[in-house]
């Protein structure tokens, strides 16, 4: 409806329609496809409301683009190396968006992305570009053919590495963008190997050559030494000024192979991503690997087994553009009446319901690596928080949510996230979009404990692990990551010290060039989950670049650390730590709590304990009313009697009184590693 409505406003006259024709003729050498009587795809005629004119709208004929004329590629880069600006320039070069459109980072800031935050993790855009693949034409007898280019824009962050790998599976090539001044960074390394493992053709693009500190020759040498990419293959560009951009699209067409699918095989589509639209429901980004898809087809999901009818199909040019059909090798969107994005699993295979096909390889369900409890700051706001989380998870299927209760914080939710960035953005959106003020508990990672009877249990919430279990814990395991760190060589010493303190194991250590060092460490995920990146930036004056990927579980001596207030454990503050660090972490926790818990009319004892063994203790003295103020001398026994009475009252208060824990205390506990 949105597309039809937009057309009804713009096409007020035949003159406007002719402008649309001339606009598309820039991309398409086949003007016949814009004829008014083309009934092949069922999108010719739209009926509008009484105050608008009836117009005939014709889609682009996708059958004119066999797989030989299709190129699917992605742009991968480290943060701030110019990926989004380069994507903007390519969209402008092909006429997909107008120059000076007033919206920089167009693919990062489509309406759905601006409104949905992290939900639209992969965005696609279809472009048309005329290019003579076999050298210049002699005379004007033949017009150069038009190629259909699908840009699949992916995030660079490690939290979404699975989504990125699925998006790359739909590509045959990638532009590896590197800053001419900063050179190869940690995410450059991670992204290159993701593309390399997917067997993609990698085209190195050295961007920002207009900067005064740019040194393209040094970057070429780095790319050669680290990835064995030939210096002669590198493209030198400046997305900001437009310098060198004219060589990017020809390189994409010449170097990247066409999609390898079979048009006469049964339909197989790879689901790249999805988002929720209030009017259309779930909109899925898909890549057609084999076969073809038409509007009205019945499709099934290999992951869930559910069946759907295709209500709308098309591509992003750059907004939703209905075509009624998608052919082999093409990338676009489908609307199938899904109610929730939880039904749209990233990496899933979609196929015609009447056929049986082999699912595409590589599908994995979402793997949650960080868990945190979310509670309303005001206990009475549980229903409002419940509504906010339901609305948010309707759009972001990668968050797991289960209800839980805490004796200290009341009713709340235990949420699982893909990583730290995912968790931070989720919290931020809850507050910004829904005004939900939440208390979040210390983030934890999934541990595995084995008991003396041989049973194993995965623990996502430390409070669920008994402090004095009836069965003895015989072994425990924690998840680890392989971290890539690139730093200036003068900071090598402090970084090695930091990684050693965080129980890191060095895997690799080399120099990229005379100025920068490359290091790989295996680190427990628990050690980097809170403040490792901040510490790393601090000791390297902000020059470090850091990236990580999930690794296997490793055995570790883990213990549950309880926080007790006046002898009562606070379940929301329990945490699981390594035995060697338990005393230090316990001391830090009780010191923080002493600063943030207000004095009461009775004494408060704060303890950190492992089972029944107390490892750290602090006491907050009681506020004391001067009960002797009214005694002006006289018998000392009168004063003693008043003091004894006060002492008894304090004891009774301590026994029945509750300690109020401010929200700031929970936020401060997040910073204790």
Swiss-Prot record:
Known function = Promotes mitochondrial protein synthesis. May act as a fidelity factor of the translation reaction, by catalyzing a one-codon backward translocation of tRNAs on improperly translocated ribosomes. Binds to mitochondrial ribosomes in a GTP-dependent manner.
Q: Which UniProt keywords apply?
A: GTP-binding, Hydrolase, Membrane, Mitochondrion, Mitochondrion inner membrane, Nucleotide-binding, Protein biosynthesis
Q: Which family does it belong to?
A: Belongs to the TRAFAC class translation factor GTPase superfamily. Classic translation factor GTPase family. LepA subfamily.
- Cellular component GO terms, alphabetical: mitochondrial inner membrane; mitochondrial matrix; mitochondrion
Domain tr-type G: where?
68-260
Q: Which cell locations does it reside in?
A: Mitochondrion inner membrane
Single GO molecular function: GTPase activity
> What is the protein named?
Translation factor GUF1 homolog, mitochondrial
Record flagged with keyword Mitochondrion: yes
Predominant localisation class:
mitochondrion
- PROSITE patterns per UniProt: G_TR_1, G_TR_2
What EC number(s) is this enzyme filed under? 3.6.5.-
Which residues take part in binding GTP?
77-84, 153-157, 207-210
**Which NCBIfam families does the record match to this protein?**
lepA, small_GTP
The record's section on SUPFAM superfamilies has: EF-G C-terminal domain-like (SSF54980), P-loop containing nucleoside triphosphate hydrolases (SSF52540), Translation proteins (SSF50447)
Q: How does it sit in the membrane?
A: Peripheral membrane protein
Q: From the UniProt record, give one GO term of the biological process aspect.
A: positive regulation of translation
Q: From what superkingdom does this record's organism come?
A: Eukaryota
Known catalysed reaction(s)?
GTP + H2O = GDP + phosphate + H(+)
Q: What class of enzyme is it?
A: hydrolase
- Supply any other comment: This protein may be expected to contain an N-terminal transit peptide but none has been predicted.
């Amino acid at each position: 409806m949105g597309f039809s409505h937009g057309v009804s406003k713009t096409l007020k006259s035949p003159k406007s329609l002719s402008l649309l024709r001339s606009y598309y003729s820039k991309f398409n050498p086949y003007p016949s496809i814009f004829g008014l009587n083309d009934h092949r795809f069922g999108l010719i005629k739209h009926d509008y409301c009484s105050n608008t004119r009836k117009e005939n709208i014709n889609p682009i004929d996708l059958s004119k683009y066999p797989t030989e004329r299709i190129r699917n590629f992605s742009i991968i880069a480290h943060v701030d190396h110019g990926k989004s600006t380069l994507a903007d320039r390519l969209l402008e070069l092909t006429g997909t968006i107008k120059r000076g459109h007033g919206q920089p980072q167009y693919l990062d800031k489509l309406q759905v992305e601006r409104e949905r935050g992290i939900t639209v993790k992969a965005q696609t855009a279809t472009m048309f570009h005329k290019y003579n693949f076999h050298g210049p034409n002699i005379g004007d007898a033949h017009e150069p053919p038009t190629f259909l280019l699908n840009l699949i824009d992916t995030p660079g962050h490690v939290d979404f590495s699975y989504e990125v790998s699925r998006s790359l599976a739909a590509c045959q090539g990638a532009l590896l963008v590197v800053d001419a001044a900063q050179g190869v960074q940690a995410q450059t390394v991670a992204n290159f190997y993701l593309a390399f493992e997917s067997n993609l053709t990698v085209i190195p693009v050295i961007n920002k050559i207009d900067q005064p500190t740019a040194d393209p020759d040094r970057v070429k040498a780095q790319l050669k030494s680290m990835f064995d990419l030939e210096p002669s293959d590198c493209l030198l560009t400046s997305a900001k000024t437009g310098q060198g951009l004219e060589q990017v699209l020809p390189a994409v067409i010449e170097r990247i192979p066409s999609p390898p699918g079979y048009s006469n095989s049964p339909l197989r589509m790879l689901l790249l991503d999805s988002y929720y639209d209030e009017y259309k429901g779930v909109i899925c980004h898909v890549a057609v690997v084999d076969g073809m898809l038409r509007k009205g087809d019945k499709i099934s999901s290999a992951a869930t087994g559910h069946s759907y009818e295709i209500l709308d199909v098309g591509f992003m040019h750059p907004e939703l553009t209905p075509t009624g059909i998608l052919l082999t090798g093409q990338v676009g969107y489908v609307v199938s009446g899904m109610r929730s994005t939880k039904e749209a699993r990233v990496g899933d295979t979609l196929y015609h319901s009447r056929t049986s096909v082999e699912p595409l390889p590589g599908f994995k369900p979402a793997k949650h690596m960080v868990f945190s409890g979310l509670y309303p700051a005001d206990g009475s706001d549980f229903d409002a928080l419940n509504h906010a989380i339901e609305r948010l998870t309707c759009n972001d299927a990668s968050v797991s949510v289960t209800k839980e209760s805490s004796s200290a914080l009341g009713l709340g939710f235990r949420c699982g996230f893909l990583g730290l960035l995912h968790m931070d953005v989720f919290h931020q959106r809850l507050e910004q979009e829904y005004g939900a003020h939440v208390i979040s508990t210390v983030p934890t990672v999934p541990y595995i404990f084995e008991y003396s009877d041989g049973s194993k249990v995965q623990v996502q919430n430390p409070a669920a692990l008994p402090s004095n279990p009836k069965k003895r814990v015989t072994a425990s395991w924690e998840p680890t990551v392989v971290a890539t760190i690139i730093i200036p060589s003068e900071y090598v010493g402090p970084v090695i010290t930091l990684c050693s303190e965080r129980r890191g194991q060095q895997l690799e250590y080399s120099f990229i060039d005379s100025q920068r060092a490359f290091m790989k460490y295996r680190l427990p995920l628990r050690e980097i989950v809170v403040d490792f990146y901040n510490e790393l930036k601090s000791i390297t004056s902000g020059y470090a670049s850091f990236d990580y990927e999930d690794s296997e579980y490793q055995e570790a001596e883990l213990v549950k650390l309880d926080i007790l207030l006046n002898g009562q454990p606070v379940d929301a503050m329990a945490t699981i730590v390594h035995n060697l660090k338990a005393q230090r972490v316990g001391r830090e926790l009780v010191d923080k709590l002493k600063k943030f818990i207000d004095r009461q009319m009775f004494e408060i004892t704060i303890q950190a304990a492992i089972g029944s063994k107390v490892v750290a203790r602090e006491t907050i003295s009681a506020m004391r009313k001067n009960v002797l103020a009214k005694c002006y001398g006289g018998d000392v026994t009168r004063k003693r009697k008043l003091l004894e009475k006060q002492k008894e009252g304090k004891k009774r208060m301590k026994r029945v009184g509750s300690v109020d824990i401010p929200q700031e205390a929970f936020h401060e506990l997040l910073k204790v590693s």
